[in-house]
């Protein structure tokens, strides 16, 4: 069965909600198994869903909420380009710590069950050095 534009759009919409709400919570994180392939690769040079999950849990005091602004879906090549805003929110107060724009490029695959999965993620950050440095400060703890 061929993958449709609507399937990819719905998959990505669910993904952004899931990442923002579930991926960074230890008891909810594996809800994201429906989005990430077990061997997902990242442009940062690491791979594997479990490794990515550990990274997502490495900042328990703040939440990373990702909101898509524009999606460009290529059905034929199973790719999605997304302009997103990432907002880092302090969990205890709800205070916004940082917002940064990103362009994310998702390569998708279809697993043995016929389900879409993200198999590769490349992220390109906004070219504001101050925002990038602040983001890295929060990521490093």
Give the role of each language-model region.
Residues 2, 14, 18, 45-48, ...:
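Residue-identity detector for glycine
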Residues 12-19, 36, 52, 56, ...:
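Hydrophobic alpha-helical core bundles mediating ligand binding, dimerization, or RNAP-core interactions
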Residues 60-141:
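A beta-strand edge to alpha-helix "cap/lid" segment located at domain peripheries
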Residues 1-30, 34, 38:
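Short, low-complexity N-terminal intrinsically disordered segments enriched in polar/charged residues
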Residues 25-83:
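A solvent-exposed, acidic/Ser-Thr-rich amphipathic alpha-helical stretch
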Residues 7, 31, 51, 131-134:
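Exposed alpha-helical structural elements
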């Amino acid at each position: 069965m061929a993958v449709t534009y609507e399937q990819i759009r719905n998959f990505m919409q669910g993904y952004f909600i899931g990442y923002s709400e579930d991926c960074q919570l230890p008891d909810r994180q594996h809800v994201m198994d429906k989005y990430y392939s077990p061997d997902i690769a990242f442009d940062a040079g690491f791979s594997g869903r479990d490794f990515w999950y550990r990274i997502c849990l490495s900042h328990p005091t703040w939440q990373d909420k990702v909101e898509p602004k524009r999606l460009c879906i290529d059905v034929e090549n199973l790719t999605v380009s997304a302009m997103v805003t990432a907002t880092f929110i302090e969990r205890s107060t709800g205070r916004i710590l940082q917002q940064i724009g990103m362009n994310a490029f998702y390569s998708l695959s279809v697993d043995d069950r016929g389900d879409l999965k993200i198999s590769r993620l490349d992220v390109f950050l906004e070219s504001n050095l101050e925002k990038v440095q602040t983001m890295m400060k929060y990521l490093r703890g």
